[in-house]
Amino acid sequence: MELKCLNWFENRGNDSRFLFLKARRADNAVVYLRFVQHFYYVVRADAVADIAQPLAWTRALGPMSVVSIDEIVARSAKIPERQRSEIELCLVASERKLAPPEVFMSDFLNVSWFFVAHDIDPDGCYRVDPALLRDLGSNCFHCDDPGACFAEKIPRFNVTRSGLFLDIECHFEKKFPSVFKNAVSHISFCVVDKDGAERRFTLTNSDMLSDADLEEAARREIPVCLDPADVKFDAEVTLCPEVTLLRVAKRLLEMPLDFVVTFNGHNFDLRYLDSRLSLLTGEHIRFRLPDGTETVNFCVYERTKSSHKGVGGVSSTTFHINNNNGTIYFDLYAFIQRTEKLDSYKLDAISKNAFHCTAVVEDARPDAVRFRGDRSTDADGNAAVFARVLSTGNYVTVDERVCRVLHKRVDEDGFTVDLADPAARAPGDRVTLAFGKDDVSLADMYANYSLDVCLDMARYCLHDACLCLYLWSHYGVETKIAAAASTYLLPQSVVFEYRASTCIKGPLMKLLLENRTVMVRADTKSKFFYEGGRVMAPKQKMHNKHVLIFDYNSLYPNVCIYANLSPETLVGVVVSDNRLDAEVAAVDVRRMFPAPRYIAVPCEPRSPELVAEVAIFDREAKGIIPMLLRSFLDARAKYKKLMKAAETAVDREIYNSMQYTYKITANSVYGLMGFRNSALFSYASAKSCTAIGRTMIAYLERTLDGASVCGTRLSLAAAPDNPLLRDEAFAGRAAELEIDAAVAGERTERVGFRSVYGDTDSVFLEVGASDIAFSRRVGRCLERVINEHVLFANFKVEFEAVYCNLIMQSKKKYTTIKFAVSDGGGSERVSKGTSETRRDVAPFHKLMIRKYKDMLCRALAEEGSGNVGVEILRSLEDELTFEFEARSMPLDWFLLSRTHHKNFKSPDNPNVALVTRYNAANAEAIEIGERYFFAYVCEEGPWRRRIANVKSYERVVDKTFRLDKNERIMYEVYFKRLCTEIVNLLDNKAMCTLFFERLFGSKPVFTG
């Protein structure tokens, strides 16, 4: 029979360890295969006979090169030789744990050994001989010989995965529901069966309705079911007692589906359902192995990693379900937190980020506005995706205002929707529509609960359940799971539970075995500080000319490949504690380790008493890390090619996920070299990687800073060379080149280039022109010249974008208009690292900083940066004075947010005292890890130029907070922070200082 692997999982018992495969046959039938799960050990071949415990099997690995990867540090160029030996090794498998005196390759997971030992792709398709299987009943079979069973791999075939997407609502009186006294009011399900058929329905708690409401429900013919067996899944809403509702949920969750998907359900929804079921009935959600030998109760287990590096120093905890039935329980919240960098990870913010489109106003009435979205309004195809979400949505966000849906019409290509939008609109206006959660107050709905409220809530709950399905599809989670399992040699059920240091172990183990290499350590891993990538200080604040952006392609992976950086290729590290010894050692290193076979990398010393440090790598025999990286990059290129040639959307999505997974994995290798708990840890390699990266970015800047174009001549600022090794290929390369006359076009004057900023792997190059067509042409020309004439080996750059009206606030903080590099490409406003992208900044601050940046951009485009500052500061002072006197903006515009924590090392630890005072006076306490809002409030009075102890004016703001008559917003704090950011956008420090002293009685803090 032909099988497609869907998920590998283990039993939970300790007596007999089995590994199970959930697979789908070509005819779509579900099949389970069971294998004995062994412990794997690599030992000396001559030591196998000394193992007293019974072994399941042994396999000779043959002679393997055992290499010590301890770091060799010397005071001179006379470096001791690295220990290498060839040993006959053997792989042994046992059903019980062993304790051999000497074990090799012990860092790797048993399940990865299973896949490698039997040459199995966890996500592959295979032709399996039924004669090799023993029938256990219920479509479950036992296999004693996995290698023979999976010997014939066949071309991929696709199947439709079954899934359950759900959301619950619970009655609550305070901020959070209590499982002991708050009932589950609604559970909404979206079920997709293995044939792709979709059902959506909601169960509501009839116990919470009055007799009159139940009579009204009967008149409306809303089904009421007392017994779980009577519940039909074709009704949109069904009323039933809470116990019935919970038992139906239990039945659905115990089904052998491929996926159960929730948003933060592992921590709340699923846990709440099981706890409530246990409390009311004594029953539990239970999972059963396919062979029927083991049944386990639902349980959530937690993995916690404490760190003070995160916001507020709150522990990072992930939640996992202990099921054993082959279903993958997937939490979208944890996945998106791990893979996306967003301002907020609430469902509302994630939905807005994922589902938005441009629409036009078709009709505008006082009570409603009709919007249309299709390919004519949004060419990127967002309208079709938006239409699908609109099918269940009840509210739409229009330019940051949430509007209720009054009427909607949805088809495959687009939609029309009538919204209760109070803004003044005219036919033809273009707006951005976005989806968040429905804008309803659950507290108010529960306080005024009735049948109509219950049905409204059902629509709200169903939309949240369907949002899980929409986000699942949007992020391509299914294909990402499959790609990760195949890449990392891990079961699908755990690929996103592990960190990169564990995920890399499967590919690393496979590569080591293929190259017959074993890496061993005797010393304790030691890690010292080392410098990261080079981030240049901005040379000026505002740029009225175009800036070309050039990025190195995969800089760190290519550094590792070029310099052959790997723990076993490290010849040694030469350190010196005085200048004389350092100079002598440098001469000896060049003589004893000549290029190009060796590369000597000067690095920053590892301790203050040293003055020099040089790491030497042998480039002759390829190292494990470069080979690993090359395999990832080659695999990525292969899947990108397959993606372009794919005939179906499903195949295209699968290959796209594969190439993306290999890209992420390759980029993570550098970080793992510097991570002490990683199997790839190599302090010298990680430090050398960043040192070479800094050299390469400085080389590119040196070559381009001062270059120019005049007619058909391109003059580089310096003649190209190889900054890492003496390279004969660069002999005679000139700094001047002939280029295509079409690049300059009609221009006859000389156009110069100036480096204005650089960050790790990118260079910002200002071009002395403001013609976007010319900037694009010259950028593409420079990309070709750099790659063909300036760079070498595997180093390449990419012309990424043209920035117009660039405003550099400081390192890693800028705002600009970004133009695509292709002719006719569009543009967008981009802010990186600024207050506009932070969620702990007041909306007033964001509004004003965006307004003044736009004003700066317009001024730069019209008149340059000469007299911009005067107009900016004059306008700013007028606006702030007006707001202070008129107080036109509500308190909401001045709210800040912060996560409550107890990290006393944090500079904002006074939040503990603030929250303690609030909790003492309020029933709804702020809990550790919870985000709360606060504002600066003071007594009514005139403007205060000097303020002491700013934090003493903080007040927690909840839904009941109101300003007293003798209180006001402390505008001085907000205005000072805003003005500090704005003056840092301007070049005239003297003028900014005078402005600041006049308003606030102090000098501003200027950042780099």
Curated annotation (Swiss-Prot):
Matches recorded under Pfam families: DNA_pol_B, DNA_pol_B_3, DNA_pol_B_exo1, DNAP_B_exo_N
InterPro entries in the record: DNA-dir_DNA_pol_B, DNA-dir_DNA_pol_B_CS, DNA-dir_DNA_pol_B_exonuc, DNA-dir_DNA_pol_B_multi_dom, DNA-dir_DNA_pol_B_vir_insert, DNA/RNA_pol_sf, DNA_pol_palm_dom_sf, DNA_pol_type-B
Catalytic activity: DNA(n) + a 2'-deoxyribonucleoside 5'-triphosphate = DNA(n+1) + diphosphate
EC number: 2.7.7.7
Major enzyme class: transferase
Keyword DNA-binding: yes
Keyword terms of this UniProt record: DNA replication, DNA-binding, DNA-directed DNA polymerase, Nucleotidyltransferase, Transferase, Viral DNA replication
GO MF: DNA binding; DNA-directed DNA polymerase activity; nucleotide binding
GO biological process: one example: viral DNA genome replication
Subunit structure, interactors included: Interacts with A20. Component of the Uracil-DNA glycosylase(UDG)-A20-polymerase complex; A20 and UDG form a heterodimeric processivity factor that associates with E9 to form the processive polymerase holoenzyme.
Family membership: Belongs to the DNA polymerase type-B family.
Record's function text: Catalyzes DNA synthesis. Acquires processivity by associating with a heterodimeric processivity factor comprised of the viral A20 and D4 proteins, thereby forming the DNA polymerase holoenzyme. Displays 3'- to 5' exonuclease activity. Might participate in viral DNA recombination. Does not perform translesion synthesis across an abasic site.
Protein name: DNA polymerase
Organism field: Orf virus (strain NZ2) (OV NZ-2)
